[in-house]
UniProtKB/Swiss-Prot annotation:
Residues 1-18 are cytoplasmic. Belongs to the dicarboxylate/amino acid:cation symporter (DAACS) (TC 2.A.23) family. This is Excitatory amino acid transporter. The lineage of its organism: Eukaryota, Metazoa, Ecdysozoa, Nematoda, Chromadorea. Residues 117-198 are extracellular. SUPFAM superfamilies: Proton glutamate symport protein. The chain crosses the membrane at residues 19-39, 59-79, 96-116, 199-219, 239-259, 281-301, 369-389, 400-420. It comes from Caenorhabditis elegans.
Length: 503
């Protein structure tokens, strides 16, 4: 074998060994899709499809199991090691970035859907009318957001969140007892809808984050007094990340089963793709522009660094998000990519990423804006400039309120449609392709969070380094003072000449 060939082979083997997990994860996505399409011809029963998806279900369980301890330990340990000024700077930088990129994503989506015009009334005739949709109120949703930010019971927030539900109520008393009124009462004509604030299952991520931020900042203000408590959360954070690394080696098999099972679940794949092809092209084009042009441009302008080199280090997180369709479930892998591959300070990642996984939903905001205007187009409704602005603002706010769980975009979509008076039931028409779009927009959400962490780190690196130098100086001074005190104590314990003479 020639020397050059042998060297190239060694380099390739070395690269594969170093990036084995990444290679396995990418292969699992490709093989999962391929096997899914090949097995569609067998027309497997729902029970058999469930068995195929089961290893993927276990992966989701394992990743979600890590979310609560990871958010608590990462946020508290990260903020506790910063002073209040640094925490405020990190927070303001992160929120500014989140709001700006979300607005850019929405504008991109609206521009494309108006130019491409994927919606046509004939599509609705082919697909049929939608099923009855849920009632939803923008005001009630915003109130729920605030209620969830400040939970009345922190323990309850770990497994339940507040949600306004709407129930039909039949009047118990009527003014007129004539036959017409009684008939209307019996057939439900006098029924009215009443809003009821209830608890639904699912972790209140926003409430947990707000509570952990408060605890972290309070611990940082206590200083040395809270040292033991801070170390507890730092060590807990390291333990969770060690567990995550173990789970990551199972993730390729889990993602393979998730993708294959999801493709097998879809009915009439070819017909759905044909009828909603232009809608999918519009959404995917918007997501591609946002992830390959807008975000890299923002990153380059703010940091003067090559964004594509930075994105290469995030590939593992991007692929995992594609497989799991959950920003929160991908959070541990995103931590690992930023800290190990790209050298971002853990104090930045531990604060910026958990918040970003909850409120920064660029892909979701873009998708909601496109879907809302697409539904208007298939209903033959022409939206005025004011209504388009309303769509953009509502899509931005709705994406912030979206929980970082699979298909949350469909739920918040109801807000956008209600805001401009479009039929809510037509959301069901685009559900058929949401399984694919959900995965891709989630991967864009994760990419946006990670690039935000990189930008925040760029602007806060000098402050963090200065804080570290000050802490090191203070620690050295403290050690010197303790040594001096020990020497003085030893000197004072020695007997004097008079004491020696007396003895």
């Amino acid at each position: 074998m020639p020397p050059d060939t042998r060297i190239n082979k060694e380099i390739m083997v070395s690269w594969i060994r170093k990036n084995l997990l990444l290679v396995l994860t990418v292969s699992s996505v490709v093989l999962g899709a391929l096997c899914g399409f090949l097995l569609r011809g067998l027309q497997l029963s729902p029970q058999n499809i469930m068995y195929i998806s089961f290893p993927g279900e276990l992966l989701m369980h394992m990743l979600k199991m890590m979310i609560l301890p990871l958010i608590m330990s990462s946020l508290i340990s990260g903020l506790a090691q910063l002073d209040a000024r640094q925490s405020g700077k990190l927070g303001s930088l992160a929120v500014t970035y989140y709001m700006f990129t979300t607005a850019v994503a929405v504008v991109t989506g609206i521009f494309l859907v108006l130019v491409i015009h994927p919606g046509d009334p004939t599509i609705k005739k082919e697909i049929g009318t939608g099923t009855e949709g849920k009632t939803v109120s923008t005001v009630d949703t915003l109130l729920d957001l605030l209620r969830n930010m400040f939970p009345e019971n922190v323990v309850q927030a770990t497994f339940q969140q507040v949600q306004t539900k709407y129930i039909k109520v039949r009047p118990k008393v009527v003014k007129n007892n004539d036959s017409a009124t009684l008939a209307a009462l019996n057939n439900g004509s006098l029924d009215y809808v009443k809003a009821s604030v209830e608890y639904t299952s699912g972790m209140n991520v926003l409430g947990v984050i707000v509570f952990c931020i408060a605890i972290g900042i309070s611990l940082s203000q206590l200083g040395q007094e809270a040292h033991v408590m801070v170390q507890f959360f730092v060590i807990m954070d390291k333990v969770i990340m060690k567990l995550v690394m173990t789970v990551m080696w199972y993730s390729p098999f889990g993602i393979f089963c998730l993708i294959m099972g999801k493709i097998l679940e879809i009915h009439d794949l070819a017909d759905t793709a044909r009828m909603l092809a232009m809608y999918m092209v519009t959404v995917l084009s918007g997501l591609a522009i946002h992830s390959l042009i807008s975000l890299p441009l923002i990153f380059f302008v703010t940091t003067k660094k090559n964004p594509y080199v930075f994105m290469r280090g995030l590939f593992q997180a991007w692929i995992t998000a594609l497989g799991t369709a959950s920003s929160s479930a991908t959070l541990p892998i995103t931590f690992n990519c930023l800290e190990e591959n790209l050298g971002v300070d853990r104090r930045v990642t531990r604060f910026v990423l958990p918040v970003g996984a909850t409120i920064n939903m660029d892909g979701t905001a873009l998708y909601e804006a496109v879907a809302a205007i697409f539904i208007a187009q298939i209903n033959g409704v022409h939206l005025s400039f004011g209504q388009v602005v309303t769509v953009s603002l509502t899509a931005t706010l709705a994406s912030i309120g979206a929980a970082s769980v699979p298909s949350a975009g469909l739920v918040t979509m109801l807000l956008v449609l209600t805001a401009v008076g479009l039929p809510v039931k037509d959301v069901s028409l685009i559900v058929a392709v949401d399984w694919l779009l959900d995965r891709i927009r989630t991967s864009i959400n994760v990419l946006g969070d990670a690039m935000g962490a990189g930008i925040v780190y760029h602007y806060s690196k000098a402050d963090l380094d200065a804080h570290d130098r000050l802490a090191a100086t203070t620690r050295s001074h403290s050690i010197a003072m303790n040594d001096e005190k020990r020497q003085l104590a030893v000197y004072n314990s020695l007997p004097t000449d008079d004491e020696k003479h007396t003895h």
